[in-house]
Amino acid sequence: MSVDVRPFPRVDWSPIPAEGATGVDSRALLHADGLFVAQLRFAEHATIHEHPSANEIVALCLEGEGFTSVGDETAPIRAGEQAHWPPNVPHRLWTEGSTMLTLMIERPSAE
């Protein structure tokens, strides 16, 4: 058996084009077999508006700190912590007086 090593596209940072997203840049790292992995870079006072997703999402905070909400609950999220967003539940991610770098892992729901 040989090791399967292949290139992947190197994508530059670009602003998230979604309406309601301000001060957030992203770059996709992987999009294959229903799995989507991206980095998000939040400026101070940046936000991704509240929205649901049909997929399950894990948000890992790599640097900095911010806030997340899931449904009616809100919590801080800091470097070294992760948030889990179940499918079809409105969620939001934002910063106030700090920047934040996250790794987002989105996969189809097991439901």
Residue ranges of model-derived segments:
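A short, N-terminal "cap"/entry segment at the start of jelly-roll beta-barrel domains
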Residues: 1-34, 38
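Conserved short histidine dyad/triad with adjacent acidic residue
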Residues: 36-53, 87
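Short, surface-exposed secondary-structure edge patches
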Residues: 39, 58, 73-75
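Short, conserved beta-strand element in jelly-roll/cupin
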Residues: 41-43, 52-68
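Short acidic-glycine-tyrosine-enriched beta hairpin
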Residues: 72-88
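Ligand-binding loop in jelly-roll beta-barrel domains
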Residues: 87-111
